[in-house]
């Protein structure tokens, strides 16, 4: 109440609480037998909201007006609305990205004559670092009927209520949603990545009447960069007469994986065209595979060492590693078969006399 007096008699002092009301099941409440006077000013303020709702902080000031001598009391209807509390769901998306290149130099030594010897080639290693990912799209689905305290059904179980796309910082957020349980599932992976098909769950619960929108519920997802498996097989000529081909000669064979073009990382470093990335040896079954993590680009496979009895195969097998879509975890590339042939020589004889004259 505000200060109010009649004929010098103080009937209300400012701040007096005239009455407290609680709404019934129909949402109505009245002042009952509280004494209130025509001409006096009163303020109606909500002190406790219904469960699931944010308190209405807007108070309403009113005054009873004289309505004639035939009316014993005045009646005033005041509507006070409440908003159902809501919440937001945010996602953060991360994954390994091609951020740099590390160059590992050749081994350097000094021989017995003081000459500097260099062993092998410089190897370029792609560096992948976990980073925020943009462009991932998520679908938010109600896992139960979403019903507010007044009985209104805002979504049925299974209804899609929102879609989220991550920004350049890897974050995405829904609009305010009604309280309840939800499933968050990735439906589109960022370019270059494998979709994470595992759903995650979020529950927006009542956080008290002071909040119209409760704190955001955060969920994190991670994507794997699409990988590549580069396979090859080997055949080596066999010569039983000279015992070549059955004495583990394959153990001396090595293949290299090289960049066929400049491949540049996010930080500006690059693998130069012709740069060696990885070396492998043959398995006992004469097969080999490169499974190192690679950025998308063009490469070639080449034999770089073989047994001393064989001719080095100089053939280059070109490999293009392209993104094959979000449903493929590893791209399988078969380079086919590389063949080694035995080194052959020719012996020629010339017959001469004791004066070296041909006969």
Regions inferred by a protein language model and the residue ranges of each:
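Solvent-exposed loop/turn and edge beta-strand elements of beta-rich ligand-binding domains
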Residues: 1-359
């Amino acid at each position: 109440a505000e200060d109010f007096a009649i004929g010098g008699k103080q009937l209300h002092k400012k701040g007096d609480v005239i009455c407290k009301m609680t709404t019934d099941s129909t949402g109505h409440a009245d002042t009952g037998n509280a004494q209130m006077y025509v001409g006096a000013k009163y303020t109606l303020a909500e002190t406790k909201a219904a469960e699931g709702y944010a308190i209405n902080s807007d108070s309403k000031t009113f005054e009873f007006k004289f309505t004639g001598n035939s009316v014993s009391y005045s009646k005033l209807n005041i509507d006070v609305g409440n908003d159902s509390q809501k919440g937001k769901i945010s996602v953060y998306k991360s994954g390994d990205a091609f951020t740099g290149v590390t160059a590992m130099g050749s081994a350097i030594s000094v021989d017995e004559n003081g000459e500097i010897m260099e062993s092998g080639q410089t190897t370029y290693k792609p560096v992948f670092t976990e980073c925020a990912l943009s462009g991932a799209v998520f679908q938010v689905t109600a896992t139960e009927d979403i019903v507010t305290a007044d009985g209104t059904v805002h979504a049925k179980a299974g209804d899609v209520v929102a879609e989220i796309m991550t920004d350049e910082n890897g974050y995405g957020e829904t609009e305010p949603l009604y309280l309840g349980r939800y499933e968050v599932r990735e439906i589109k992976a960022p370019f270059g990545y494998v979709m994470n098909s595992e759903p995650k769950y979020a529950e927006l619960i009542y956080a008290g009447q002071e909040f119209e929108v409760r704190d955001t519920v955060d969920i994190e997802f991670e994507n794997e960069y699409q990988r590549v498996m580069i396979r090859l097989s080997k055949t080596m000529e066999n010569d039983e007469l000279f015992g070549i081909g059955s004495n583990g000669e394959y153990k001396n064979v090595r293949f290299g994986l090289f960049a066929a073009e400049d491949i540049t990382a996010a930080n500006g470093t690059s693998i130069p065209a012709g740069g060696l990335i990885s070396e492998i040896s043959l398995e006992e079954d004469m097969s080999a595979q490169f499974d190192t993590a690679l950025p998308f680009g063009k490469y070639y496979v080449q034999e770089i060492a073989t047994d001393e009895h064989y001719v080095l195969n100089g053939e280059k097998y070109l490999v293009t590693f392209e993104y094959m879509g979000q449903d493929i975890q590893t791209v399988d590339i078969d380079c086919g078969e590389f063949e080694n042939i035995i080194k052959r020589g020719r012996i020629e004889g010339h017959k001469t006399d004791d004066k070296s004259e041909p006969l």
